[in-house]
Regions:
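ATP-binding N-terminal substructure of ATP-dependent carboxylate-amine bond-forming enzymes
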Residues: 1-77
């Protein structure tokens, strides 16, 4: 079983994943762009990383940023 997972999503879907992971004893890592810093998924996660940018094209859609966070956070998946 995974001990820590990276949630490469935001909004309600990310919140549901985080809540379920918590029930299973799995730690969570969220990513966020600058405008999403105070979003619910960021506040619910055990850890978060700001990947910068103001738009999805500048943040969530840059796979290299997500992979970098995966490595830095030591998440299993």
């Amino acid at each position: 079983m995974f001990k820590k997972i990276l949630i490469a999503n935001r909004g309600e879907i990310a919140c549901r994943i985080i809540k379920t992971a918590r029930k299973l004893g799995i730690k969570t890592v969220a990513i966020c762009s600058d405008p999403d810093l105070n979003s619910p998924h960021v506040n619910l996660a055990d850890e978060y990383f700001n990947i910068g940018g103001n738009t999805s094209a500048e943040s969530y859609l840059i796979i290299e940023k997500i992979i970098d966070v995966l490595k830095k956070s030591n998440a299993d998946a």
